[in-house]
From Swiss-Prot:
<dbReference type="InterPro" id="IPR027640">
    <property type="entry name" value="Kinesin-like_fam"/>
</dbReference>
<dbReference type="InterPro" id="IPR019821">
    <property type="entry name" value="Kinesin_motor_CS"/>
</dbReference>
<feature type="region of interest" description="Disordered">
    <location>
        <begin position="389"/>
        <end position="423"/>
    </location>
</feature>
<keyword id="KW-0067">ATP-binding</keyword>
<dbReference type="InterPro" id="IPR003583">
    <property type="entry name" value="Hlx-hairpin-Hlx_DNA-bd_motif"/>
</dbReference>
<dbReference type="GO" id="GO:0051310">
    <property type="term" value="P:metaphase chromosome alignment"/>
</dbReference>
<keyword id="KW-0238">DNA-binding</keyword>
<keyword id="KW-0505">Motor protein</keyword>
<feature type="modified residue" description="Phosphoserine">
    <location>
        <position position="560"/>
    </location>
</feature>
<feature type="modified residue" description="Phosphoserine">
    <location>
        <position position="422"/>
    </location>
</feature>
<comment type="subunit">
    <text>Interacts with FAM83D and SIAH1.</text>
</comment>
<feature type="cross-link" description="Glycyl lysine isopeptide (Lys-Gly) (interchain with G-Cter in SUMO2)">
    <location>
        <position position="460"/>
    </location>
</feature>
<feature type="coiled-coil region">
    <location>
        <begin position="460"/>
        <end position="498"/>
    </location>
</feature>
<dbReference type="GO" id="GO:0005874">
    <property type="term" value="C:microtubule"/>
</dbReference>
<dbReference type="GO" id="GO:0005737">
    <property type="term" value="C:cytoplasm"/>
</dbReference>
<keyword id="KW-0493">Microtubule</keyword>
<dbReference type="GO" id="GO:0006281">
    <property type="term" value="P:DNA repair"/>
</dbReference>
Length: 662
């Protein structure tokens, strides 16, 4: 089979395989993708706590069978509300029953490169921490799951098995919307990120490798003491934070094609919702309770959004829901253990927990296998300068000295047939599936070769293209040199014909641009466009007076310019207004201020509803205005506003009267 393939085809096929890097195969094979999985919900009813049950106290919740329960209807005491879940564990159920019935079956998914999560939900004092941690006599879900998972990894990763497995653990808490590393408490608040493939990760989170249950206990027990707990009126050891234990299982295939898998297990102990009227929380405890209730409220919003199919799911509204993005509506096999209490004083909390559990079981997750393929990458072949440029270009780059001292090249012996077939001989050890892929690739290359498709990736063809490019550049340089010589000849001819032109040309054109002196004309004055007539200044008669409107500082005033002093006058355009029209405009504005109504006053520029009312009120109290400048005496109109009013209205009126040059 190896000898039947052309040598060039085998080299290209080997390069295509060996040159491939790490490719994502998270959706490898439609048949291997698991079907959508619904969030499984189990309800655990804890027994009465010692000292809390009275003689006539009966539980408000009663189990019907292994999957259903009923609770009294608070609206109608003669009716009961029935709930059905995937599993129901009564007060006589043990830790082993809960673990074996609901948690243990999902551990196998981790060895398939899939994610799984277990959440303990319920009100404060319902037994969530006991379900997850337990006691030395009755271990909970976390120690049992780690013990079985480590045993599975030892069996699957033993010598002679196709996969090598490794397990790491991380432990964190979400306290008042801060992500804290319990393995390294000094790390501070950590951030939650999302990579390009949609995976949730926490940069800087400590990961401890574990190979046995003793390793797990050595890291987990001290970290558990770092979790924030506090005493309330309802619970002496109330968890004040959400605790998350993250266990990663990495698998590497020992033989080709060297696949890699990663499975993550989330074990989450949620803090309980609290009624501050009953817990008596104050100060710090009240702040902690607010953060807990807020995150649990957002968790309920996420569940409702997933069930209703809303376009936006509010994962980012809380650190807890952001971290649980894989568990609810994501790619994990999820188990929700709702813990409830039998006491009647917890009735409303129990109903709320059951309603949340009933909504959660409608959430659909879509698990997939986190698998990637790692192929060996060959080192790039280093080519010499002579092989890249060719013989002629290499001689030009070396120079005459190196060319004389160069030793003659020895003839290279042709490669043997076994050396030519060496890239393909490595394929004989591969599995049949990989060999089938290689054969299909060979057939594809053969079909392209039969159609005359050029193979431009060979070193000889690349060298020829490079040499052709260099030759084209050389021709372009020669053309530019010839053009430069022609231009220089023209310049010399012009210099010989006209010495004066030569001097001007040499000082302006042949001088470098960076050294040219640029003469800047005197800047023109900035003219403000006003509704006045623009005239060009004419030669005035002696001793004539011209009134010109000029700007000096922040105020405008009329100045007299003696036209008999021509050296002080500047050529240009000036703004002029007739004194008669100015007086007429002032009188018209004064009449309008004294006789006009508020509506008439609003027709003036810079006068609005408020200022018009102020003017009318001042006129009624103090009588008519004697001059336009009295407008400044009105309360609420400053001197600057009065000047702006005069400029806007008097000049506009003058323009309307058709003022001309004086």
């Amino acid at each position: 089979m190896d000898a039947g393939l052309p040598a060039r085809r085998r080299r290209e096929m080997a390069a295509a395989i060996s040159g491939a890097g790490r490719c994502r195969l998270s959706k490898v094979g439609a048949g291997r993708r698991p079907p959508p999985a619904r969030v499984r919900v189990a309800v655990r009813l804890r027994p009465f706590v010692d000292g809390t049950a009275g003689e006539n106290d009966t539980p408000c919740v009663r189990g019907l069978d292994s999957c259903s329960l009923e609770i009294a209807n608070w609206r109608n005491h003669q009716e009961t509300l029935k709930y059905q879940f995937d599993a129901f564990y009564g007060e006589r159920s043990s830790q082993q029953d809960i673990y074996a019935g609901s948690v243990q079956p999902i551990l196998r998914h981790l060895l398939e490169g899939q994610n799984a999560s277990v959440l303990a939900y319920g009100p404060t004092g319902a037994g969530k921490t006991h379900t997850m941690l337990g006691s030395p006599e009755q271990p909970g879900v976390i120690p049992r799951a780690l013990m079985d998972l480590l045993q599975l990894t030892r069996e699957e990763g033993a010598e002679g098995r196709p996969w090598a497995l490794s397990v790491t653990m991380s432990y964190l808490e979400i306290y008042q919307e801060k992500v804290l590393d319990l393995l390294e408490p000094s790390s501070g608040d950590l951030v939650i990120r999302e990579d390009c493939r949609g995976n949730i990760l926490i940069p800087g989170l400590t990961q401890k490798p574990i190979t046995s249950f003793a390793d797990f206990e050595r890291h987990f027990l001290p970290a558990s003491r770092n979790r924030t707990v506090g005493a309330t009126r309802l619970n002496q050891r109330s968890s004040r934070s959400h605790a998350v234990l993250l266990v990663k299982v990495d698998q590497r295939e020992r033989l080709a094609p060297f696949r890699q898998r990663e499975g993550k297990l989330y074990l989450i102990d949620l803090a309980g919702s609290e009624d501050n009227r009953r817990t008596g929380n104050k100060g710090l405890r009240l702040k902690e309770s607010g953060a807990i209730n807020t995150s649990l409220f957002v968790l309920g919003k996420v569940v409702d959004a997933l069930n209703q199919g809303l376009p936006r799911v509010p994962y980012r509204d809380s650190k807890l829901t952001r971290l649980l993005q894989d568990s609810l509506g994501g790619s994990a096999h999820s188990i929700l253990i709702a813990n409830i209490a039998p006491e009647r004083r917890f009735y409303l909390d129990t109903v709320s927990a059951l309603n949340f559990a009933a909504r959660s079981k409608e959430v659909i997750n879509r698990p997939f296998t986190n698998e990637s393929l790692q192929l060996p990458v060959l080192a790039p072949v280093k080519l010499s300068q002579k092989e890249l440029l060719g013989p002629s270009e290499a001689k030009r780059a070396r120079g005459p000295e190196e060319e004389e001292t160069e030793s003659p090249e020895l003839p290279i012996a042709p490669a043997s047939a076994s050396q030519k077939l060496s890239p393909l001989q490595k394929l004989s050890s591969m599995d049949p599936a990989m060999l089938e892929r290689l054969l299909s690739l060979d057939r594809l290359l053969g079909s392209q070769g039969s159609q005359g498709t050029p193979l431009l990736s060979t070193p000889k063809r690349e060298r020829m293209v490079l040499m052709k490019t260099v030759e084209e550049k050389d021709l372009e340089i020669e053309r530019l040199k010839m053009k430069q010589k022609e231009l220089e000849a023209k310049v010399l001819a012009q210099e010989a014909a006209d010495p004066k032109e030569k001097e001007n040309y040499s000082t302006t054109m042949l001088r470098p641009l960076a050294r040219r002196t640029v003469t800047v004309a005197k800047p023109l004055k900035k003219a403000v466009v006003m509704p006045l007539q623009l005239i060009q200044e004419q030669a005035a008669s002696p001793n004539a007076k011209i009134h010109i409107l000029k700007k000096k500082g922040r105020k405008r005033k009329l100045e007299s310019l003696d036209a008999s002093q021509p050296e002080k006058a500047e050529d240009g355009w000036e703004l002029q207004i007739s004194p008669e029209l100015l007086a007429h405009g002032r009188q018209k504005i004064l009449d309008l201020l004294n006789e006009g109504s508020a509506r008439d006053l609003r027709s003036l520029q810079r006068i609005g509803q408020k200022k018009a009312q102020l003017i009318v009120g001042w006129r009624e109290l103090h009588g008519p205005f004697s001059q336009v400048e009295d407008l400044e005496r009105v309360e609420g109109i400053s001197g600057k506003q009065m000047e702006s009013f005069l400029k806007a209205n008097i000049l506009g009126l003058a323009a309307g009267q058709g003022c001309g040059p004086s």
